Amino acid sequence: MIAIIDYGLGNVKNVQRAVQYLGYDAILTDKYNEIANADVVILPGVGHFKDAMQAINERGLANIITSITDKPVIGICLGMQLFYRWSAEGDVEGLNIFPGNIIPIQSPYPVPHLGWNNLISKHPLLLHDVYFVHAYQAEMSQHVVAYTEYGTKIPAIVQYQNYIGIQFHPEKSGDDGLAILNQALKGGFQDDQTMASN
């Protein structure tokens, strides 16, 4: 069973449909026990970082999200950004799973970064065009598995142990996006040969 955390922000139904299309059972939940007992946990999100952290804290979910060690935990779009220490969007602390901060995209191109862009990675699955919608980004680090170029390098997939962050929307990225989501559900992409920043 896959638990998709429903904390009041985000495209939870679209993510649920994508996961079910891949053949998995998926529930929408904000219940501690259901999250703890799931095989995989997904933290989606669309909206403002500060609002999302407030909603997570009001539901008492920060502790369970940050304490999981035995299963994949996947953050999508804003959900990925919540994994970081701090965000300039609202000047608020995140879940502090990944070191580093969420910062405004510094690009000569229009912001938000909206539409299709290609992934750059050493992983053979991560060389496709995928769909982005965001105005903030993570900093480049050793945890980046794939990135995209938009006048600057933007982390697109990050992984630290069992935590996987996906900045783009795999559920809106066609068959390639679904294949990437499926690999994340199976545990992700990280090994010594696939880190994009090496």
From Swiss-Prot:
Q: Which InterPro entries match?
A: Class_I_gatase-like (IPR029062), GATASE (IPR017926), Imidazole-glycPsynth_HisH (IPR010139)
Q: Which GO terms describe its biological process?
A: L-histidine biosynthetic process
Which positions form S-S bridges?
none
Q: Does the keyword Cytoplasm apply?
A: yes
**Could you name the domain of life of the organism this protein comes from?**
Bacteria
Q: Which residues form the Glutamine amidotransferase type-1 domain?
A: 1-194
Respond yes or no to whether keyword Lyase is given for this record.
yes
Q: What is its EC number?
A: 4.3.2.10, 3.5.1.2
What this protein catalyses is: 5-[(5-phospho-1-deoxy-D-ribulos-1-ylimino)methylamino]-1-(5-phospho-beta-D-ribosyl)imidazole-4-carboxamide + L-glutamine = D-erythro-1-(imidazol-4-yl)glycerol 3-phosphate + 5-amino-1-(5-phospho-beta-D-ribosyl)imidazole-4-carboxamide + L-glutamate + H(+); L-glutamine + H2O = L-glutamate + NH4(+)
Q: Which UniProt keywords apply?
A: Amino-acid biosynthesis, Cytoplasm, Glutamine amidotransferase, Histidine biosynthesis, Hydrolase, Lyase
The pathway where this protein functions is:
Amino-acid biosynthesis; L-histidine biosynthesis; L-histidine from 5-phospho-alpha-D-ribose 1-diphosphate: step 5/9
Q: Name one GO cellular component term.
A: cytoplasm
Q: Name one GO molecular function term.
A: glutaminase activity
Q: Where does the protein principally reside?
A: cytoplasm
Report the active site residues: 77, 169, 171
Q: Where in the cell is it found?
A: Cytoplasm
Task: Enumerate the HAMAP family for this protein.
Answer: HisH
Q: How does it assemble?
A: Heterodimer of HisH and HisF.
Role noted for this protein: IGPS catalyzes the conversion of PRFAR and glutamine to IGP, AICAR and glutamate. The HisH subunit catalyzes the hydrolysis of glutamine to glutamate and ammonia as part of the synthesis of IGP and AICAR. The resulting ammonia molecule is channeled to the active site of HisF.
Report the protein name in the record: Imidazole glycerol phosphate synthase subunit HisH
Species name: Staphylococcus saprophyticus subsp. saprophyticus (strain ATCC 15305 / DSM 20229 / NCIMB 8711 / NCTC 7292 / S-41)
Lineage of the organism = Bacteria, Bacillati, Bacillota, Bacilli, Bacillales
